[in-house]
């Protein structure tokens, strides 16, 4: 009864007003699954390929009708009649059908949309929540959120070089409480910024995007907001940063234009050592550029013993690149974005490799999101303990937090909220 009888894709809009792919899968039993594919702004060069139309007369070339056609044509013809519960086989068939190393023929956006919608349909068939279907009976760890409350870099039109300034409410007793704490800090920050004469417009991920002069100024405002909300920085609330360093890496140097600094790899490592020494920063994502492996090694050797060093553009949720990084002793954590690799099976494999090698994993959104809340379920399914899904505004971000609240309620007394322990590596 779990045989696939229909797969239908359409072009919808994401949170930035750009087209993306939505896929619906229907099974013989009547079970149904729907998934929408996210899209990034600061994308890694090694990511799977999002298939765009390139027709400048339509959505500025960003249309996804070719990807939609891939789903409604070749992919449906190939998967029709197969059992939706055979996720690994279905994903493998689509990858083989595409026939390229980076999914550029059918499009990672096409393959991922089908992959996630199939999983949702199978969960519906078995009358299980998605996190339980994917993760089994042991899926019960709620993630600590990394909440991006000040946006810079490619996510905002301001001078700040660092892309994301995040708070982690580790002192909460439940996931719902951590979300409440984050919301209180968010509103306290808004007041602090307004009182100082700064604008409180928000960036792509719902965080504020004020015209601040430096990383220090941004961190200073966040520290004051945490205290104004009644919490202790370094105890109740920890800080995390996403540098997206590849975005300002030019000719072997890190060009921090907003701060007027031009640093070599050693200088960039020293920059991070200074910051983590002065603020309760426990996690730095993409602290070095995606292909600066020597720089990454130096950073890991310098602060990796005490700071979570997350590879996003570095690893692009790719099991092969992650395995190489592990063998070279680079970073100690992976950011997990389903659309970077383009299938549920490969995403879960990346998390498995990370966790089995003592690396942490952080489930993540993209800057271009939809109301789809799949990543909330995947965070719980993988027991990864951390999630990055934006600030406390914009419904495309809040949808994930609300789903976590529902999941926690459904788990009842079985739920685990790790708090600070989420940062501990195996």
Curated annotation (Swiss-Prot):
Its cofactor is Mg(2+). It is found in: Cytoplasm; Secreted; Cell surface. GO terms for biological process: glycolytic process. One of its GO terms (molecular function) is magnesium ion binding. The active site is at residues 205, 337. Keywords: Cytoplasm, Glycolysis, Lyase, Magnesium, Metal-binding, Secreted. CDD domains: enolase. Pathway: Carbohydrate degradation; glycolysis; pyruvate from D-glyceraldehyde 3-phosphate: step 4/5. It is an enzyme of class 4 (lyase). Mg(2+) binds at residues 242, 285, 312. Pfam families: Enolase_C, Enolase_N. Binds a second Mg(2+) ion via substrate during catalysis. (2R)-2-phosphoglycerate binds at residues 163, 337, 366-367, 388. Its EC number is 4.2.1.11. PROSITE patterns: ENOLASE (PS00164). The keyword Magnesium applies. Belongs to the enolase family. NCBIfam families: eno. Catalyzes the reversible conversion of 2-phosphoglycerate (2-PG) into phosphoenolpyruvate (PEP). It is essential for the degradation of carbohydrates via glycolysis. This is Enolase. It comes from Rhodospirillum centenum (strain ATCC 51521 / SW). The gene is eno.
